[in-house]
Regions:
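A short hydrophobic beta-strand segment most commonly corresponding to one strand
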Residues: 34, 60-63, 75-91
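Conserved metal-binding segment of the jelly-roll/cupin
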Residues: 55-68
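Short, Lys/Arg-enriched, Trp-marked, Pro/Gly-tolerant hinge/linker segments that flank
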Residues: 97-163, 169-185
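Terminal helix-turn-helix DNA-binding modules in bacterial transcription factors
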Residues: 141, 145, 154, 173-217, ...
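Proline-centered helix-kink/hinge sites
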Residues: 179, 227-228
């Protein structure tokens, strides 16, 4: 990952994911466009429990802020280029999708991304669930707005007029994870970006709401299967 100015970054890396698995992918603040070219394996998304695939081995994936998607990967090898930023860009779409593309070469800047997406008429939605309950939508919005302050799930439930148990059941039914799990994954996503831009681990722990450094390490390793220091090293490897 190459860190640019104004919270922008560029990706140019190999993909090598062994095995066969499905899991939720959480993208926090900011947005990202990836162009993926597969040389081996299978990579698609689930939307409303249906498979959404590219028709070619080269395709784009767009993630707007605070996205939850559900990819399925099977022994994938290939390459990914990408461009993302933390700052809001009004011209960009508000929902995640994939699209076929013949784009080759790096993504230059925000304007380049806007032009590419505007010229992608074959968009296929990868929204996890298009029939979310109003309760889950409101709960997710509250978490998205307050995740760095460590919002209490019990307090969110009370604010929404339901029990924590009812909120957790409905949220998990809609998003395939509990609200607590979503909160922690969102914070780890934020921590990963901060590691990439060179912030100190102890500062990151505090900034994403973990006042206890050991708890931060535990949650980070649980979600990423690696430590913050190891993750920083991987992010800084040359493409």
């Amino acid at each position: 990952m190459d860190i640019l100015a104004d919270g922008e970054y560029r990706i140019n890396d190999e993909i090598d994911i062994g095995g066969d698995g499905i899991s939720n992918f959480i993208f926090g603040r900011g947005w990202l466009l990836e162009i993926i070219e597969l040389s081996k394996g299978d990579f698609f998304f689930y939307s409303d429990d249906k498979e959404v695939r590219s028709t070619t081995t080269r395709f784009g994936v767009f993630y707007p802020p605070f996205t939850i998607v559900r990819p399925h990967v099977r022994n994938v090898k290939g390459r990914v280029i990408g461009f993302g930023a933390v700052r809001s860009v009004p011209e960009l779409p508000q929902t995640p999708f994939i699209f076929d593309t013949d784009l080759d070469g790096i993504l230059v800047n925000v304007d380049h991304v806007v032009r590419i997406l505007a010229a992608s008429p074959d968009r296929r939605s990868i929204v996890l669930n298009s029939k979310l309950s109003f309760l889950s939508i409101k709960a997710k919005r509250l978490i998205d707005e307050n995740y760095l302050a460590y919002p209490s799930i019990s307090r969110i439930a009370a604010r929404l007029g339901v029990s924590p148990e009812h909120l957790s059941r409905q949220f998990k039914r809609d998003y395939y994870m509990s609200p607590s799990s979503y909160l922690h994954q969102l914070r780890v996503s934020e921590a990963t970006f901060r590691l990439a831009i060179g912030e100190e681990i102890i500062d990151i722990s505090n900034e994403v709401g973990y006042n206890d450094l050991s708890r931060f390490y535990k949650q980070f390793k649980k979600r990423t299967k690696t430590s913050p220091a190891e993750c920083r090293t991987m992010l800084k490897k040359p493409a």
